Regions:
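Residue-level detector of functional hotspots within protein domains
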Residues: 5, 15, 28-30, 56, ...
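C-terminal regions of mature proteins
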Residues: 79-146
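Non-catalytic beta-strand/loop surface segments
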Residues: 6-53, 115-137, 145-146
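M16/insulysin-pitrilysin zinc metalloprotease superfamily fold
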Residues: 10-11, 33-89
């Protein structure tokens, strides 16, 4: 899922560049993916003076990718970038210890993610894309500072 979300809205994506250059977002913009027993959730978050416009742009970008699909070269580049980020995360002792604890309590091996990540294909990403990011199951939540 992280590969999919990074291709759509990561810092090197067309969407991010367009929103940032248009001053609709700042560098706090990003995404998260949550999952648990019986649920999952994608969250796009950040600061904006026009959150409705940002939401419209995100929905529009998802729609464009539904029509055009994802480029194999962009997929491979994103996959390598995120794999490298996973490896760099191993240099952080506190983060590694946290990941090991989370994996242990989930009954998993912290290094299994590396093996799984290496086997992900563009077809896998397209399959999950077909099942997720439905605009009819989305909501915009805005927290005003006042």
């Amino acid at each position: 899922m992280e590969i999919l979300l990074d291709m759509i809205s990561g810092q090197s994506s067309e969407l991010y560049k367009r929103l940032f250059d248009g001053k609709l977002i700042n560098n706090s913009f990003g995404f998260e993916y949550f999952t648990g027993f019986g649920y999952s959730c994608v969250l796009f978050a950040g600061e904006s003076n026009d959150p409705k416009k940002v939401a419209e742009e995100i929905v529009g970008e998802i729609g464009r990718f539904r029509e055009t699909g994802f480029d194999e070269t962009a997929f491979e580049r994103t996959k390598k970038k995120l794999y490298g980020r996973m490896i760099m995360g191993m240099n952080d002792i506190e983060g590694l210890a946290n990941n090991m604890a989370v994996s242990y309590f989930a009954g998993e091996d912290v290094f299994t993610d590396f093996e799984i990540f290496k086997t992900v294909t563009l077809d896998d990403v397209n399959d999950i894309f077909k099942k997720t990011l439905d605009k009819n199951r989305s909501v915009l939540s805005v927290i005003n500072p006042n």
